[in-house]
Amino acid sequence: PEEICTLVIAESFPEDAGIFTCSARNDYGSVTSTAQLVVTSANTENCSYDSMGEPNSDHFQHFPPPPPILETGSYELASQKPSEIQQVNTPNLGFNMAALQMQFNSAERETNGVHPSHGVNGLINGKAYGNKSPPTPAALLSPTKEPPPLLAKPKLGFPKKASRTARIASDEEIQGTKDAVIQDLERKLRFKEDLLNNGQPRLTYEERMARRLLGADSANVFNIQEPEETAANQEYKVSSCEQRLISEIEYRLERSPVEESGDEVQEAEVPVENAAAPFFEMKLKHYKIFEGMPVTFTCRVAGSPKPKIYWFKDGKQISPKSDHYTIQRDVDGTCSLHTTASTLDDDGNYTIMAANTQGRVSCTGRLMVQAVNQRGRSPRSPPGHPHARRPRSRSRDSGDENEPIQERFFRPHFLQAPGDLTVQEGKLCRMDCKVSGLPTPDLSWQLDGKPIRPDSAHKMLVRENGVHSLIIEPVTSRDAGIYTCIATNRAGQNSFNLELVVAAKEAHKAPVFIEKLQNTGVADGYPVRLECRVSGVPPPQIFWKKENESLTHSTDRVSMHQDNHGYICLLIQGATKEDAGWYTVSAKNEAGIVSCTARLDVY
């Protein structure tokens, strides 16, 4: 991503001259850019205005050095006759006058002839001429290679030479002019945005640079500081990371129980063929505003029967009786949530969910609330109120101008959390959760209020999809209790609790034969029983085999029987010669297996 880095010198002095280097580094390398700053000192003879000067006084020939670009010089363009224009052959003025002419033309083109009081460089003072362009001094249009002349318009009479030193502008004048420059630039950007919305050409490179220097929220700041213009909420697009977070919140809310207010009237049932799941005809939008401003989320929902509406902030349901939020619903399905004065705590994701008997649907709008002084500039003084005077030294300590940029923090929020668990002793237990927040929260686990330390039986893992897991293997009776998961970051903390119940391990006992099979003989055509008794904990499973062939199911002639007391029987109705042979019965459970064999003879 691009980033514009700017070094601003509010008032230049000769000692500021030199080579300035900007370096950028990351893990993959570094890059540098170098530029030289030349500061031209003022001439020994400086100009001043004589309020009582005569019309035929000598014209002045020396000027203070021009102010640097993006600063606060305030020369006026005089629409004098060519005979009254004086040329000053000072090479150092060439670049600044070229910049002045470029800005002059740009301002005229972008404002349809209405010339702002200050341009981007702070070099223009003009007036509104309606649809007519002001007369352009001939000297500025001269195609010669000589430096363009500097035009001056004296307030009273013509300027004359004077031996006094130039007056240094006061802090109030400097600050006032800087504010005027910034205000004018914001006006131009707003005007350009209106053109863009109407399909006009895109912003130029210089305008994009100015937008980045002022910040993307320049239009909103302008609205706040000029009350005569209506402040409007600024829509913006959320990042892919925020969109994933929004999707996870909606997925969870649509599958979670909600609190019923009881105020809504129960809708009459509609025929199944006329029923329709809720859907949004107009979804919520994302807004970026300043604290103290009002904001309204609006959408329109339809469905049959009429859906019930629920509002959430960061996954937490908003009560319809909230004092801070006003919730409304019109007959056409338009739903709105409004707050008259937003605070920094209102920053977050706002979700509306519509539900009826056919299903649920939700959509989310992101609200970004910014502090009024977020851009690092002090609020402008109201009209008629001068700026407070601050001490200023030649060293120009810029400590106040290097205030840190305000970061965005989001309190941890659990997107997924487990409920109470019951696990058998000796088994594996896994507790999974997923949390969001900025910066990334740190998770800790507690058992009955005591921290859990990782060891051979307790492991804490984080998967690539952001799911945190506490794994206990094997579970013992000491692991039973109330578990607390705490997520913490710079914005705050959040937690959830669950209870783990450990079921006692059964006392396993291997099967054992109390009575074994006995060798048996039977006459052909008569019934016969092969019987035994077995015990074991848990009760064992029984398997029968004849020779090496398994008897898997009973038939009308050969059936297998078993009761709860361990009695086992193989019943053969009408034995034949083919039934003779060796029979084996096996008993098996988790603790072991045991077998017994006997012979059946048929004669």
From Swiss-Prot:
Keywords on record: Actin-binding, Cell junction, Cell projection, Cytoplasm, Cytoskeleton, Disulfide bond, Immunoglobulin domain, Phosphoprotein, Repeat
Residues bearing PTM Phosphothreonine: T136
Positions of disulphide bridges: C433-C485
Gene Ontology BP annotations: actin cytoskeleton organization; cell migration; cellular response to hypoxia; epithelial cell morphogenesis; keratinocyte development; neuron projection development; positive regulation of podosome assembly; ruffle organization
Stretch list, region Interaction with EZR: 414-503, 513-603
InterPro entries: Ig-like_dom, Ig-like_dom_sf, Ig-like_fold, Ig_I-set, Ig_sub, Ig_sub2, Palladin_C
Recorded GO MF terms: actin binding; cytoskeletal protein binding
Subcellular location(s) of the protein: Cytoplasm, Cytoskeleton; Cell junction, Focal adhesion; Cytoplasm, Myofibril, Sarcomere, Z line; Cell projection, Ruffle
Highest taxon of source: Eukaryota
Annotated tissue distribution: In adult central nervous system is detected in the brain and spinal cord, specially in the olfactory bulb, cerebral and cerebellar cortices, hippocampus, amygdala, superior colluculus, and superficial laminae of the spinal dorsal horn.
Region (Interaction with VASP): 63-67
Function: Cytoskeletal protein required for organization of normal actin cytoskeleton. Roles in establishing cell morphology, motility, cell adhesion and cell-extracellular matrix interactions in a variety of cell types. May function as a scaffolding molecule with the potential to influence both actin polymerization and the assembly of existing actin filaments into higher-order arrays. Binds to proteins that bind to either monomeric or filamentous actin. Localizes at sites where active actin remodeling takes place, such as lamellipodia and membrane ruffles.
Subunit structure of this chain's protein: Interacts with EPS8. Interacts with LASP1. Interacts with VASP. Interacts with ACTN. Interacts with SORBS2. Interacts with PFN1. Interacts with LPP. Interacts with SPIN90. Interacts with SRC. Interacts with EZR. Interacts with RAI14.
Family: Belongs to the myotilin/palladin family.
The name this protein goes by in its record: Palladin
Organism: Rattus norvegicus
Gene name of this polypeptide: Palld
